[in-house]
Amino acid sequence: MVSKGLLRLVSSVNRRKMKLLLGIALFAYAASVWGNFVNMRSIQENGELKIESKIEEIIEPLREKIRDLEKSFTQKYPPVKFLSEKDRKRILITGGAGFVGSHLTDKLMMDGHEVTVVDNFFTGRKRNVEHWIGHENFELINHDVVEPLYIEVDQIYHLASPASPPNYMYNPIKTLKTNTIGTLNMLGLAKRVGARLLLASTSEVYGDPEVHPQSEDYWGHVNPIGPRACYDEGKRVAETMCYAYMKQEGVEVRVARIFNTFGPRMHMNDGRVVSNFILQALQGEPLTVYGSGSQTRAFQYVSDLVNGLVALMNSNVSSPVNLGNPEEHTILEFAQLIKNLVGSGSEIQFLSEAQDDPQKRKPDIKKAKLMLGWEPVVPLEEGLNKAIHYFRKELEYQANNQYIPKPKPARVKKGRTRHS
């Protein structure tokens, strides 16, 4: 009897233990399952986010391509001439989204060539060439010429460089690199693919000239360590590089010494005299003249320059050629003319003269006339009216985008500016 009772007691205790152990085991299992579920859900959510992010990275460029294709079907491009395969050239324009470069792009596209624009958008703007995006003959590449470029082309227009005083003084080292390393890279490309290269040089290589007007055989009167030297000397070195490659490597080069140019797509606050005067007159602010205003400049309209660049590229002239308008005016005359054309009540304000500001600049273009059959044809007032119209539209655009530009002086010395 005792043994049976004891057995039942032990059996009862074992059942209770088993139930307890089973309960603990079930609880532990449930806790483990819940923990794994929560962990897996977290991993899944993170994974889904990562996958979605990766998919978005892949899909976004495709969306952009689709938008460009849709635009190409609906967009009306400027009229383009048809050229045969033999006559159509593959042309590279460095700095092609800039002021002059974008007008050159228009000219070459409308002439029927295949144009590749390379720009790092330091001063260039996509807006300047967006009307060609999607066209089968056009390609836009975001690239800095200080890095090598590998592309098959027949001609290279090397325009890449900051060209207005505020821009090249803001980053003089970048300006030097663009005009030296960038030019070396483009010459190396021209050598590899057998292309002809045109360097957009500048009248600044003449410095503050002691000879007037300036012809191509004048060596200049320059300050190699002055505030503008990064640009002036950069272009002088670029010319030297071109002729070294021509003599040693047989590269075909053309060098255009470009004088003051104006027209639509100029930056309104780039610190140049024409853009400054137009912007000040439109905004009713004083037109700032540095010094007495007796300094002289000769301004050409941008379409004249573009025609000159194309004529030079397709010529047999390998020595430097001046491209500019020999019609000379004082800075004060420009201020008064722009004020009258705008119909502005702005006053003319005289400020202290800037350091290294050339007193006279006027091109001798006999060589261009004789060897290229080129000379400017757009009258000054006609060109200024076109520029003023563009600036009015640009001010409206900027106002709609909550940005009102102000004339931007070149920082030279104690806040002084210069006439470019």
Curated annotation (Swiss-Prot):
GO molecular function term, any single one: identical protein binding
GO cellular component: catalytic complex; cytoplasm; Golgi cisterna membrane; Golgi membrane
Protein family (similarity comment): Belongs to the NAD(P)-dependent epimerase/dehydratase family. UDP-glucuronic acid decarboxylase subfamily.
Assembly description: Homodimer and homotetramer. Interacts with AKT1.
Name this polypeptide is given: UDP-glucuronic acid decarboxylase 1
PANTHER family for this protein: UDP-GLUCURONIC ACID DECARBOXYLASE 1, UDP-GLUCURONIC ACID DECARBOXYLASE-RELATED
Lineage: Eukaryota, Metazoa, Chordata, Craniata, Vertebrata
Binding annotation for NAD(+): 98-100, 119-120, 122-124, 144-145, 159, 161, 178, 200, 231, 235, 261, 267, 272
One Pfam family this sequence matches: UXS1_N
Organism: Rattus norvegicus (Rat)
InterPro entries named in the record: NAD(P)-bd_dom, NAD(P)-bd_dom_sf, UXS-like, UXS1_N
Organs and tissues of expression: Ubiquitous. Detected in heart, brain, spleen, lung, testis, liver, skeletal muscle and kidney.
Gene behind the chain: Uxs1
Glycosites: N316
Cellular localization per UniProt: Golgi apparatus, Golgi stack membrane
Modified residues (N-acetylmethionine): M1
Membrane topology of the entry: Single-pass type II membrane protein
Phosphothreonine modifications at: T94
Active site per the UniProt annotation: Y231
UniProt main location, coarse: Golgi
Biological process terms in GO annotation: D-xylose metabolic process; UDP-D-xylose biosynthetic process
Keyword Signal: no
Topology Cytoplasmic: residue spans: 1-19
Pathway: Nucleotide-sugar biosynthesis; UDP-alpha-D-xylose biosynthesis; UDP-alpha-D-xylose from UDP-alpha-D-glucuronate: step 1/1
Documented EC number(s): 4.1.1.35
Cofactor entry: NAD(+)
Superkingdom, natural source: Eukaryota
Record topology, Lumenal segments: 41-420
